[in-house]
Swiss-Prot record:
The lineage of its organism: Eukaryota, Fungi, Dikarya, Ascomycota, Pezizomycotina. This is Class I hydrophobin dewE. Its main location: secreted. It comes from Emericella nidulans (strain FGSC A4 / ATCC 38163 / CBS 112.46 / NRRL 194 / M139). Belongs to the fungal hydrophobin family. The keyword Secreted applies. Keywords: Conidiation, Disulfide bond, Secreted, Signal, Sporulation.
């Protein structure tokens, strides 16, 4: 019984990871979809990253429900940013320090 439960949990986690990882086809966002300003993020990771998942859990967020990347150490996008601007569509927490559902803007917008 425990093996079946463990396999079920792994199957659900695997499918959640696959759906949480952005694909090239749907990771681009329109600026009108963004919550808050465009962000310059220190790094982007999957919501199920072993370092990020416990943090999300502490603030009551189900990592498996996030569509897109998690932006870490973000701030409002400006001329000093060396990466492309990120549009976060699910949450912009702590002044952008943690952005949920992040991805690049559609080209041409």
């Amino acid at each position: 019984m425990k093996v079946a439960t463990a396999l079920s949990v792994l199957a659900v986690a695997g499918s959640a990871l696959a759906s949480a990882l952005p694909s090239a086809a749907n990771s681009e966002k329109r600026q009108s979809d963004c919550i808050g300003p465009l962000l310059c993020c220190g790094s982007l990771t999957t919501p199920l990253d072993p370092l990020v998942d416990p943090i999300l859990e502490l603030v009551g967020i189900d990592a498996a429900a996030i569509v897109g990347s998690v932006g870490l150490l973000c701030h409002a996008y400006d001329d000093t940013c060396t990466s492309e601007p990120q549009c976060c569509t699910e949450a912009n927490l702590l002044g952008g320090t943690l952005g949920l559902g992040c991805g690049p803007l559609e080209h041409g917008h």
